Amino acid sequence: MEEKVLVTGGAGYIGSHTVLELLEAGYSPVVIDNFHNSIRGEDSMPESLRRVQELTGRSVEFEEMDILDQAALQHLFKKHNFKAVIHFAGLKAVGESVQKPLDYYRVNLTGTIQLLEIMRAMGVKSLVFSSSATVYGKPVPASGRGPPHRGCTKPYGKSKFFIEEMIQDLCRADTAWNAVLLRYFIPIGAHRSARIGEDPQGIPNNLMPYVSQVAIGRREALNVFGDDYATEDGTGVRDYIHVVDLAKGHIAALKKLKEQCGCRIYNLGTGTGYSVLQMVQAMEKASGKKIPYKVVARREGDVAACYANPSLAHEELGWTAALGLDRMCEDLWRWQKQNPSGLGAHG
């Protein structure tokens, strides 16, 4: 019998790639999503998951649901015998969180508390949580062996930090709980089929979707926020990870839960940092297009460099990021070329 796993927020970028990996690994995912970060396709199915079904030849059980809808969540848990939960659902734009802090705390914190309460009531005490490198605040590099930096500056990062603390407290209070908290660095790229990928609504918040939209002609030029950092070329250095590697990390995390692991925290990154200009050059190479850019003022709160120490994930999960920068950019460009309007243009 295939294990049923609840995936909250499973129609988004990382979620849809993880659902595909779950299916390929023999799990039976049940996905809930409220379409905040996803496109509605045919039959009220998220377009991303419709394409996952097409790629795998398997059906995905999906319910439109908001993480804040306690009654609907309770009903869902009564209907299914879940063995574990992978929790992606939440608001995720760092900049927007500064403008709308209460929204971020309500959705991310209250939504998670309600989910944990229902899990506890139903005896489902295995969780993989989608955390973020933003919990580190401003260390360079983020080591992952020590505690997070308490200098999270934005409500988004704080919400992830508070949830991590909450889950750790829960695991300490009740040893029947097992949780793996995955701190993501920056996912880029797309599935090699180019059928699913990152489809930001409106102006992309992240560097590489913006760069790829410049390459295909949807946007005029890239703004580079500062070229006077203490880095090799003066631009900010970050750790970029292929979304497929990141998705595979969740499969490794589910296996870890079976070991009665308590609460474990891992960085999912490559351990290598690339600057903004290095990323532009890599995308120019992959696309064969010149990517115009202009240097503008630094963004408040940006750090010079942030990259992962993923050694603990390698040691304890047997997980390593396998796909390099060239492959990330090639897959991203293929996705952008074949889906110039994103998932909105069904096909």
UniProtKB/Swiss-Prot annotation:
Listed SUPFAM superfamilies: NAD(P)-binding Rossmann-fold domains
Binding site for NAD(+): 12-14, 33-37, 66-67, 88, 92, 160, 184
Top EC category: isomerase
Pathway: Carbohydrate metabolism; galactose metabolism
Cofactor(s) annotated in UniProt: NAD(+)
Catalytic activity: UDP-alpha-D-glucose = UDP-alpha-D-galactose; UDP-N-acetyl-alpha-D-glucosamine = UDP-N-acetyl-alpha-D-galactosamine
Taxonomy, superkingdom: Eukaryota
GO cellular component, one term: cytosol
Residues noted as binding substrate in the record, renumbered to the chain: 132-134, 184-186, 205-207, 223-225, 238, 299-302
Active site: 156
UniProt cross-references to Pfam families, sorted A to Z: GDP_Man_Dehyd (PF16363)
Keywords, in A-Z order: Carbohydrate metabolism, Galactose metabolism, Isomerase, NAD
Enzyme Commission code: 5.1.3.2, 5.1.3.7
Record GO biological process: galactose catabolic process; galactose catabolic process via UDP-galactose, Leloir pathway; galactose metabolic process
GO molecular function per UniProt: identical protein binding; protein homodimerization activity; UDP-glucose 4-epimerase activity; UDP-N-acetylglucosamine 4-epimerase activity
InterPro entries found in the cross-reference section: NAD(P)-bd_dom (IPR016040), NAD(P)-bd_dom_sf (IPR036291), UDP_G4E (IPR005886)
Family: Belongs to the NAD(P)-dependent epimerase/dehydratase family.
Record function comment: Catalyzes two distinct but analogous reactions: the reversible epimerization of UDP-glucose to UDP-galactose and the reversible epimerization of UDP-N-acetylglucosamine to UDP-N-acetylgalactosamine. The reaction with UDP-Gal plays a critical role in the Leloir pathway of galactose catabolism in which galactose is converted to the glycolytic intermediate glucose 6-phosphate. It contributes to the catabolism of dietary galactose and enables the endogenous biosynthesis of both UDP-Gal and UDP-GalNAc when exogenous sources are limited.
NCBIfam families, alphabetized: galE, PRK10675.1
Subunit comment: Homodimer.
Protein name: UDP-glucose 4-epimerase
Organism: Rattus norvegicus
Gene: Gale
